[in-house]
Amino acid sequence: MKPYPDNQWNSWQEGDDGTNKWVCVQAVYVDAENNLWVVDPACPNMEQVYDASVKLVKFNLATNRIEDVYRFEDVLSNKSYINDVRVDTHRQVAYLTNSNEGGIVVVNLETGTSRQVLRNHPSVKHDPSFTLIVDGKEFKKQGQPVHLQSDGIALTPDGEWLYYKPLTDNKLYRIRTDYLRNEALPDDQREAAVEDLGQFAVTDGMIFDINGNLYLGDYQHDKLVRLTPAHKLEDVVADERLIWPDSYSMSTDGYLYISCSQINKQPDYNEGENKRTTPYAIYRMKLPDT
């Protein structure tokens, strides 16, 4: 293992200029054209954005060189936390979730402009009626229930639908992407286009396969599930090693790669006791029907 793309980008310390350094990378994503996208919310401990350093960085994996850096100073507040990203290379649009405040950030990759939409819609907010149980107890941080907003995000293979959900409840939503891309559309019409698909799994990240199956981690039960194109929920695998399955990548030879972040084992959620085990692991499994 080595720092990517180099030591300088990985050298940030508090007090440094973070505009061209990683402050706290949250997610990575490889698009259909073999570009790597790195999400840096620049918000240590999810408390406050550091010195306007929030960014989305595009790398060409053929050269490992930066091609673009997208910044959000006039779009996001200093309490925001951009969490995950999906990129439509055909339409040249990126979609990101804001998990601190709730919202979908839409980036026009050709012009570099961005907007945040659905900010006040229930679909990007934790369901207040839902009590999150993990490891047999209510999930709390320093004694308070944890409520996080829009987090997991996935784009259908044809780019027509964006699926998303809050981190700490079991609801799943989707919206046609043309409602997100249309800058002239009034907010109320965009919000009316959101579809509530119902209650499924409490998941962090999620990803579509080429057949339109949506894979989700069920971090309450250490397992992986999938939602078929007909919106039928199926169990894929249960394994005690799947401790908070978090992010995913799909290979061209039909393997799903899974990173497990063990968030529920961190001291903040266990009265100061660190229950994590090392080393952290990335797992893979051959997917059915691929």
Segments the model singles out, each with a brief description of its role:
Residues 109-114, 121-123, 174-186, 287-290:
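Short loop/turn segments immediately following beta-strands, especially the blade-tip
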Residues 249-290:
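Blade-level signature of beta-propeller repeat domains, shared across WD40, Kelch, NHL, RCC1
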Residues 1-14, 67-71, 115-130, 182-198, ...:
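Beta-propeller fold detector
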Residues 38-42, 96-100, 156, 164-167, ...:
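Conserved beta-strand positions in repeat-built beta-propeller and related beta-rich domains
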Residues 13-39, 75-94, 124-161, 169, ...:
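Beta-rich, blade/repeat-based domains predominating
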Residues 22, 43-44, 49-93, 97, ...:
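Asp-box/WD-like beta-propeller blade repeats and closely related beta-sheet repeat scaffolds
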Residues 52-64, 107, 112, 272-289:
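Beta-propeller blade signature
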Residues 47-54, 99-100, 167-168, 220, ...:
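Short, solvent-exposed loop/turn segments at conserved positions within beta-propeller repeat blades
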